[in-house]
């Protein structure tokens, strides 16, 4: 996250870090939505993925941190683009449910969608500098706004006007998600409204907001997958 500050240690109990068994680098974020399921972006998938919950600082452990491996990973079966970026959403079922604790708790799925002008919060362990490869020891947070979708369409050819995405940022620039924040949540009014999908390079440029998968449109898919209906397709 560029243009942010260290998150409050108690404001992100649902935020998870994704890395692999072969690398301790956090390549993506994600969000815990119940004791057994994590929501993230499809492009965050890796072999040998690991999920760390209850983490704040990479160096100073929270006493209630937990690590999990996937029992299953679920994607949209009906993507239009071969890379699946038009439906950039993935559900990870944890091999063992987590125990909720001080720093581990779920975030609610959206009860309604949020419109242009809504103020939302972004968070993650991604890059904090637009010019250098600086990654923080702690997650950074900041507030951005949902903006008109037309700002994103020319920037990201895989997000047509009818795509189930949100365009969000600060039009004058300066505050944005960045490398390593992918898959993390866009939180509006205490609910997860978006998943970090893609952005411009470098991050936080003037008139270049980022694109987020619109979670509200996938509520039905998410609930079906969790309920055990594996044949459900994502909205077109």
From Swiss-Prot:
Residues 1-227 form the Peptidase S1 domain. It is an enzyme of class 3 (hydrolase). Glycans are attached at residue 229. Disulfide bonds join 7-141, 28-44, 76-234, 120-188, 152-167, 178-203. It is found in: Secreted. Pfam families: Trypsin. Coiled coil: none annotated. Inhibited by D-Phe-Pro-Arg-chloromethyl ketone (FPRCK) (97%), PMSF (76%), and benzamidine (50%). Is not inhibited by BPTI, antithrombin and EDTA. GO terms for cellular component: extracellular region; secretory granule. Its EC number is 3.4.21.95. There are three isoproteins of RVV-V, designated RVV-V alpha, V-beta, and V-gamma. Negative results: has no proteolytic effect on factor VIII, factor XIII, fibrinogen, and prothrombin. This is Factor V activator RVV-V alpha. It comes from Daboia siamensis.
């Amino acid at each position: 996250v560029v243009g942010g500050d260290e998150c409050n240690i108690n404001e992100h109990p649902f935020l998870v870090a994704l890395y692999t068994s072969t690398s301790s680098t956090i390549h993506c974020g994600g969000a815990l939505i119940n004791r057994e399921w994590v929501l993230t972006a499809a492009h965050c998938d890796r072999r040998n993925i690991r999920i760390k919950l209850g983490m704040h600082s990479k160096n100073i452990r929270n006493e209630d941190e937990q690590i999990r491996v996937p029992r299953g990973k679920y994607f949209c079966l009906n993507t239009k683009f071969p890379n699946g970026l038009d439906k950039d959403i993935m559900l990870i079922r944890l091999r063992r449910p987590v125990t909720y604790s001080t720093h581990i708790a779920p975030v609610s799925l959206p009860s309604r969608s949020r419109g242009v002008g809504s103020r939302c919060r972004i968070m993650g362990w991604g890059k904090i500098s637009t010019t250098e490869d600086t990654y923080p020891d702690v997650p950074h947070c900041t507030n951005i706004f949902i903006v008109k979708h037309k700002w994103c369409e020319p920037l990201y050819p895989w997000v047509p006007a009818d795509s189930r995405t949100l365009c969000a940022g600060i039009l004058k620039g300066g505050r944005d998600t960045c490398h390593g924040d992918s898959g993390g949540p866009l939180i509006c009014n205490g609910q997860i409204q978006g998943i970090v999908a893609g952005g411009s390079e470098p991050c936080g440029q003037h008139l270049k907001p980022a694109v987020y998968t619109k979670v509200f449109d996938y509520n039905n898919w998410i609930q079906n997958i969790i309920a055990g209906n594996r044949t459900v397709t994502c909205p077109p």
